[in-house]
Swiss-Prot record:
Function: Low-affinity receptor for leukotrienes including leukotriene B4. Mediates chemotaxis of granulocytes and macrophages. The response is mediated via G-proteins that activate a phosphatidylinositol-calcium second messenger system. The rank order of affinities for the leukotrienes is LTB4 > 12-epi-LTB4 > LTB5 > LTB3.
Spans within the Cytoplasmic topological domain: 46-60, 118-140, 207-224, 297-358
Residues carrying sugar: N10
Extracellular side: 1-24, 82-96, 162-185, 246-275
Keyword terms of this UniProt record: Cell membrane, G-protein coupled receptor, Glycoprotein, Membrane, Receptor, Transducer, Transmembrane, Transmembrane helix
One Pfam family this sequence matches: 7tm_1
GO terms assigned for molecular function: G protein-coupled peptide receptor activity; leukotriene B4 receptor activity; leukotriene receptor activity
Biased composition (Basic and acidic residues): 349-358
GO BP of this protein: chemotaxis; keratinocyte migration; negative regulation of adenylate cyclase activity; neuropeptide signaling pathway
Protein known as: Leukotriene B4 receptor 2
Similarity remark: Belongs to the G-protein coupled receptor 1 family.
Membrane topology: Multi-pass membrane protein
Length: 358
């Protein structure tokens, strides 16, 4: 693609020094937090084989860590790009690297949406829990997620171009292509999944309050987790997609108008907003620690598997450890009592009925 539509002003990803500096700082911090964090998640869950099979939620979290870790491995390239102000890998590398980034973005978004939907169904439709534990279902869902991500990421490679042999950035043959691509990306990677997440967590919280969980310690933990997940996704991705929409609208505006010139400002701000979005790949392990609470000092490095063991999806029944979230199917909906301790290895288990993961 030799001819690229460019907004007025001739700005590039490297035009604003502030955007380059903040982008570099965000990338370094994201890698510092996310690489060891996601590596720990993979180490904890990849080799975990409970007797009844790995819970669906744990499998989704494992693949989420793989997707997030893959894109964080590319941070040295982007840091070099921003600091040296020149793309280091040529035209083929420009397309390939951004394709991997888009693949990771879509996989992470789809997996997060599935996690939200799984927890919502576990609360509102507990009779579906046996099906949600099926390994065959997990394989089909993961295959669908990765195939969808592979397809949705294709435009990221098609519309990337090495401009003047030094700037790897979006290159659309016409304003219509630019508006369509950027709008579709925001719709599929933010608006629809974020709407699903908000809807699922709203329904989940409403059901938990209806079960009189809202005022107890379990309800407080669930509320903090829900708020953290929704806020992290929205806050970290909103600036990136705001730039998308700004450039999409500017592409269709009259070339001499003020709105068209804002498209150039969005292009220059893209480096910083893209780097901020990298934090979405590093915050999930922090949220798992946040969720574990008192389970972390008691269970040590295995707190993540203990967290899923306590969810009720990994076993047929048992006492709820403090800090886990369960619903038990009995003639009446009730909260499972606390065990001997939060994550205490000595906590006994009793087989008294199925429990459903939230």
């Amino acid at each position: 693609m030799s001819v690229c539509y460019r907004p007025p002003g001739n700005e590039t990803l490297l035009s604003w020094k502030t955007s380059r500096a903040t982008g570099t700082a965000f990338l370094l911090l994201a890698a510092l937090l996310g690489l060891p964090g996601n590596g720990f998640v993979v180490w904890s869950l990849a080799g975990w084989r409970p007797a009844r099979g790995r819970p669906l939620a744990a499998t989704l979290v494992l693949h989420l860590a793989l997707a997030d870790g893959a894109v964080l491995l590319l941070t040295p390239l982007f840091v070099a790009f921003l600091t040296r102000q020149a793309w280091p890998l040529g035209q083929a590398g420009c397309k390939a690297v951004y394709y991997v980034c888009a693949l990771s973005m879509y996989a992470s978004v789809l997996l997060t949406g599935l996690l939200s939907l799984q927890r919502c169904l576990a609360v509102t439709r507990p009779f579906l829990a046996p099906r949600l534990r099926s390994p065959a279902l997990a394989r089909r869902l993961l295959l669908a997620v990765w195939l969808a991500a592979l397809l949705l990421a294709v435009p990221a490679a098609v519309y990337r171009h090495l401009w003047r042999d030094r700037v790897c950035q979006l290159c659309h043959p016409s304003p219509v292509h630019a508006a369509a691509h950027l709008s579709l990306e925001t719709l599929t990677a933010f608006v629809l999944p974020f709407g699903l997440m908000l809807g699922c967590y709203s329904v989940t919280l409403a059901r938990l309050r209806g079960a009189r969980w809202g005022s107890g310690r379990h309800g407080a933990r669930v509320g903090r987790l829900v708020s953290a997940i929704v806020l992290a996704f929205g806050l970290l991705w909103a600036p990136y997609h705001a730039v998308n929409l700004l450039q999409a609208v500017a592409a269709l505006a009259p070339p001499e108008g003020a709105l068209a010139k804002l498209g150039g400002a969005g292009q220059a701000a893209r480096a910083g907003t893209t780097a901020l979005a990298f934090f979405s790949s590093s915050v999930n392990p922090v949220l798992y620690v946040f969720t574990a609470g008192d389970l972390l000092p008691r269970a040590g490095p295995r707190f993540l598997t203990r967290l899923f063991e306590g969810s009720g999806e990994a076993r047929g029944g048992g006492r709820s450890r403090e800090g886990t979230m369960e619903l038990r199917t009995t003639p009446q909906l009730k909260v499972v009592g606390q065990g001997r301790g939060n994550g205490d290895p000595g906590g006994g288990m009793e087989k008294d009925g199925p429990e459903w993961d939230l």
